[in-house]
């Protein structure tokens, strides 16, 4: 089974490397020539625990390669994963331009060939409900036949930055969205080595799969905003939020994960995905009230932290030197996207502070 990964960002690089580690022949495609050359040397473009070792080993053993040539991937692979950026647009909706362009480029290549064979196109990116349908329509518009020339699958990632390699190698579950039994069987085959410990491969329709990813991230973000609200109230009433957190976290119905109060969530996923799910609800005329609260609380946490620091020095930080430990949005990663620390630092600088930051 030959696998191609279109996009070598965080998700694409981890996905491709881990499939290669399990013995598959993997070709990763990216338009950035410098990035491709760096990866071909075995030098990762992101920091992720255990990734560099696997990258070097699989390149050396000939299972993993990198290229800028999409045609090489299109005609040399059975399964093609689209692991492309879906950044938020001005209205909060996910920008699907990269995904749609890749789908169109692949369709053009296959449509121009007399015998391109059958391919499974997999949306690995976090995408709104209906994206699989959109990709399918793009390919059908090139006169490709669904079920004969191609099938489209939704296969969201559930990787935690910092432990993404471990998450991919031993997933708690694999979600596969497709109405094609042929495509579903291929997906079972490539994921079977990862679930030998008995964790499930859940096959469902594409829209349910796409919703699963957004619902999961939005629920985790909700837990963070909830415990931050509890922490704020604890300060008012004289309670210890750490004790409260432990008290509720030992309830098996709740669990203790994501119940750590702080200055709010950040990163490339939670803020974007909560906004995108809210935007989806708006498009369908549904008022998803709790998501507004989650985002509002999260914004308030970082504002509140900066305000407290400034007010504790009488409203001015002129001449003050402040150390900031931690710039990434979470531990064990170098990802600073949407990091709450950056907002706090900017506010402290505006108040006249000198910042000494460490990570």
Map each language-model feature to its residues:
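Structural/interface elements that position substrates and couple domains in central-metabolism enzymes
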Residues: 1-359
């Amino acid at each position: 089974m030959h696998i191609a990964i279109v996009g070598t960002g965080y998700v694409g690089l981890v996905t491709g490397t881990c499939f290669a580690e399990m013995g598959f022949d993997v070709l990763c495609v990216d338009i950035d020539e410098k990035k491709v050359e760096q990866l071909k040397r075995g030098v990762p473009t992101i920091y992720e625990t255990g990734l560099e070792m696997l990258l070097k080993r699989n390149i050396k053993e000939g299972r993993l390669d990198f290229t800028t040539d999409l045609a090489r991937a299109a005609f040399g692979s059975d399964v093609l994963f689209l692991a492309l950026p879906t950044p938020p647009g001005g209205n909060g909706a996910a920008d699907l331009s990269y995904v749609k362009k890749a789908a169109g480029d692949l369709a053009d290549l296959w449509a121009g060939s007399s015998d391109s064979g059958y391919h499974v196109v997999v949306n690995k990116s976090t995408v709104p409900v209906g994206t699989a349908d959109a990709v399918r329509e793009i390919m059908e518009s090139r006169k490709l036949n669904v079920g004969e020339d191609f099938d489209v699958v939704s296969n969201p990632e559930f990787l935690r930055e910092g432990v993404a390699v471990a998450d991919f190698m031993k997933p708690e579950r694999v979600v596969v969205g497709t109405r094609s039994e042929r495509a579903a069987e291929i997906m079972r085959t490539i994921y079977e080595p990862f679930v030998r410990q008995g964790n499930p491969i859940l096959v469902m329709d594409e829209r349910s799969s796409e919703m699963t990813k957004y619902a999961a991230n939005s629920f985790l973000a909700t837990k963070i905003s909830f415990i931050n609200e509890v922490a704020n109230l604890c300060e008012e009433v004289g309670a210890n939020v750490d004790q409260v957190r432990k008290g509720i976290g030992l309830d098996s119905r709740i669990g203790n994960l994501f119940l750590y109060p702080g200055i709010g969530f950040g990163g490339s996923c939670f803020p974007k995905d909560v906004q995108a799910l809210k935007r989806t609800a708006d498009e369908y005329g549904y008022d998803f009230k709790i998501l507004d609260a989650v985002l509002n609380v999260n914004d308030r946490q970082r504002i509140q932290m900066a305000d407290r620091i400034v007010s504790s020095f009488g409203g001015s930080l002129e001449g003050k030197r402040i150390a900031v430990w931690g710039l990434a949005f979470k531990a064990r990663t170098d990802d600073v996207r949407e990091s709450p620390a950056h907002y706090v630092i900017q506010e402290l600088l505006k108040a006249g502070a000198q910042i000494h930051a460490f990570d």
